[in-house]
């Protein structure tokens, strides 16, 4: 081990977000070349106050915790490599093969809509509804937050549920024996053209936070600049979205090698994607070198029948402008799809008479009532 000043990294017990396991593995890996000490405190509030008080050097937290807690006087040092942000279905069968009318527990409104888009026949419940159906209010009230998901898994094993949908970190953190089926970002051509599931934003990030002025160079080897870029873009995107829409918006931003995009586009025969990767300043079709930043965003109606989605692929140096363009396209699309189309007297040659008739809006987001989850993730 190289001689270096000891750095104390504060953490908490597992909070169903994957941060504890992520930072623990990072300390094990980088602690071979640097003096790192992982210190556990009982609560995130305690860890933050301890850091502010001058004890400890860094607190590891999720992106959602950074938004939730009082972090005045603290700053983000950097991020670890992003963990898989997709959610999983815990069940014996893949989502395509669940029985007709299967009963699935899902707390997140966005994931409920995405599942309805894929399987409109499924019966979807929240935890509160499951507890009431099973008349288990007293039993669940006595459970700690960490025990709620093992209880849900037990209900599945007993046949009271056919499956449940959770962040990947919950399945991994509780070492559940049930099979997990990834609700992935890519459309799966092998699974009946499974629709992709753009996840809720900001999952999978582990942020390292310290007092302002902390020397970033002392932990540079632990940090992933591409994860930091993705986080800042994703957070900026969601800050620009109407708070009423945020619970039903899926967003994902990632920097990847150009070879990854080329392979996927070639496999799918996606000429549009291939053309976006070509250098327009060259007479011959030459692919512009360097990584790309992929940006995805979508929202759905409550029954999952109508989707509004946009995506862009840009070079990292153009990512901020690309984000602005993506957001404008998405909001313009939403405006068109949520507006009633009045009758028009304009007759366009080749268009049927029905073109001039009034049309109801394609999406109705005004009637949506989004209830808060009964338990935080």
Predicted ranges, named:
Residues 107-117:
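Secondary-structure junction motif
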Residues 94-98, 111, 213-219:
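Short helix-loop capping/hinge motifs at secondary-structure junctions, enriched
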Residues 372-377:
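Short "domain-exit" segments at the C-terminal end of structured domains
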Residues 59, 103-106, 164:
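Short, hydrophobic beta-strand segments that form beta-sheet elements in well-ordered domains
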Residues 65-66, 110-111, 170-171:
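Alpha-helix capping/helix-boundary segments
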Residues 1-49, 117-371:
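Small-molecule-sensing regulatory modules
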Residues 89-104, 118, 122:
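Flexible hinge/capping segments at coil-to-helix
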Residues 47-88:
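Short beta-strand-centered segments that line the small-molecule binding cleft or hinge
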């Amino acid at each position: 081990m190289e001689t270096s000043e000891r750095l104390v990294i504060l953490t908490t017990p597992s909070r169903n977000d994957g941060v504890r396991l992520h930072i623990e593995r990072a300390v094990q890996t980088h602690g071979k070349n640097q003096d790192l000490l992982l210190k556990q405190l009982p609560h995130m509030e305690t860890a933050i106050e301890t850091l502010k008080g001058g004890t400890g050097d860094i607190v590891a937290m999720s992106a959602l915790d950074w938004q939730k807690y009082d972090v005045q006087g603290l700053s983000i040092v950097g991020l670890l490599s992003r963990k898989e942000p997709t959610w999983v279905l815990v069940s014996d069968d893949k989502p395509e093969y669940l029985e007709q009318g299967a009963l699935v527990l899902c707390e997140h409104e966005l994931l409920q809509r995405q599942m309805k888009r894929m399987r409109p026949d499924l019966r979807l419940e929240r935890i509160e509804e499951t507890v009431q159906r099973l008349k288990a209010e007293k039993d669940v009230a006595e459970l700690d937050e960490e025990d709620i998901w093992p209880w849900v898994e037990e209900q599945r094993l007993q046949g009271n549920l056919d499956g449940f949908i959770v962040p990947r970190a919950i399945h991994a953190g509780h070492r559940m024996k049930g099979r997990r089926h990834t609700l992935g970002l890519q459309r799966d051509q092998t699974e009946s053209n499974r629709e992709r599931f753009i996840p809720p934003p900001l999952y999978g990030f582990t942020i390292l936070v310290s007092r302002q002025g902390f020397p970033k160079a002392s932990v540079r080897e632990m940090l992933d600049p591409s994860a930091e870029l993705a986080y800042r873009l994703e957070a900026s995107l969601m800050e620009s979205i109407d708070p009423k829409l945020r619970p039903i918006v899926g967003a994902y931003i990632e920097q990847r090698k150009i070879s990854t995009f080329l392979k996927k586009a070639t496999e799918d025969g996606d000429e549009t994607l291939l053309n976006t990767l070509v250098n327009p300043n060259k007479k011959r079709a030459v692919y512009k070198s360097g990584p790309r930043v992929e940006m995805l965003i979508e929202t759905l109606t409550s029954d999952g029948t109508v989707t509004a989605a946009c995506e862009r692929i840009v070079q990292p140096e153009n990512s901020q402008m690309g984000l602005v363009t993506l957001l404008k396209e998405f909001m313009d699309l939403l405006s068109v799809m949520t507006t009633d189309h009045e009758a028009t007297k304009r007759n366009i040659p080749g268009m049927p008479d029905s073109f001039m008739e009034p049309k109801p809006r394609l999406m109705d987001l005004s009637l949506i009532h989004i209830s808060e989850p009964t338990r935080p993730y």
